[in-house]
A protein has these predicted regions:
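Conserved beta-strand signature within the Rossmann-like core of class I S-adenosyl-L-methionine
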Residues: 176-184
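A short, conserved alpha-helix within the catalytic core of class I
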Residues: 156-169
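Conserved SAM-binding strand-loop segment of SAM-dependent methyltransferases
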Residues: 87-100
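Conserved SAM-binding motif I beta-strand of class I
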Residues: 64-69
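A short acidic, Gly/Pro-enriched loop at the edge of an enzyme's catalytic core
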Residues: 104-108, 139-148
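Conserved SAM/SAH-binding beta-strand->alpha-helix loop
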Residues: 71-73
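Conserved class I S-adenosyl-L-methionine
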Residues: 1-39, 42-50, 187
Length: 250
């Protein structure tokens, strides 16, 4: 995304959020709650957080959450909401154009102990706790910062190399961590994109586009699921979610 595109995108999304009342307790996405409810909390990254329904839910479950959005309005609102709900110590909201920058995570770009040291060997996702830093660093030569990265409906009308963003998100995981990508699999009546020719890539197509090394990442789920959704005006419709769940194994 070039400078003009990025400015236009920020202005557009700021306008979207500014035009509607601020949410006081936004709801989390159902695909997040059903996937994450039984996981032990750790460090999470919420890409395209909006006003923060997923972020706040994760924080209430004990996760430390880095929440990212292109819109300064959304980031400011989420920061205020987290504080008002007593979750300010668990939520860090940051403005990013994901085509140009990416959050480093709670311990910086090289993980909890920098480029030379392993993370906590008592991580419940990795009970054996690899002692060799080279084993922990994996194929990128760096330690991931997150146990969970979520990207719900990360669609935009502006130029964005989404596959590159999701690839970077997968690399930001610690070994054992999960990348949850939920996309629109159908066009809702209230969608901003009513193009009848629009293609909704399947979860497998998304996985192929991300092009991760199967020696280090495993697709655990690739489903198309139906649900009843409610639009901004209160109307309801049957929609399809495309759900992709990838685990980093090395």
């Amino acid at each position: 995304m070039n400078t003009t595109d990025a400015t236009d995108a920020r202005t557009s999304w700021d306008g979207v959020y500014a035009a509607r009342p601020a949410a006081t307790d936004p709801r989390p996405n159902v695909r997040l709650t059903e996937t994450v409810a039984d996981l032990p909390p750790g460090d999470a990254l919420d890409l395209g957080c909006g006003e923060g329904g997923d972020t706040l839910w994760l924080a209430r479950q004990g996760w430390r959450v880095t929440a990212v959005d292109l819109s300064a309005v959304a980031v400011e609102r989420l920061t205020g909401l987290a504080r008002s709900h007593g979750l300010g110590d668990r939520v860090t909201a940051e403005q990013h154009d994901l085509g140009a920058s990416f959050p480093e995570g709670p311990e910086g770009p090289e993980g909890p102990e920098g480029p030379e040291g392993p993370r906590d060997s008592k991580n419940p996702r990795d009970p054996q706790g690899p002692k060799d830093p080279q084993e922990l660093k994996g194929p990128l030569g760096r330690v991931g910062a997150f146990d969970l990265v979520t990207a719900h409906y990360l669609h935009t009308a502006f130029p964005l190399d989404r596959a590159a963003v999701l690839r970077r998100a997968a690399h930001a995981l610690r070994p054992g961590g999960l990348l949850l990508v939920v996309d629109h699999g159908s066009t809702a009546p209230w969608s901003w994109n009513q193009d009848p020719e629009v293609h909704h890539p399947s979860p497998r197509e998304v996985a192929e586009a991300i092009a991760l090394d199967p020696a280090a990442w495993t697709v655990e789920r690739a489903d198309a699921l139906r649900r009843r959704a409610t639009g901004p005006d209160g109307s309801t419709a049957e929609v399809t979610d495309h759900v992709l769940l990838i685990r980093r194994t090395a």
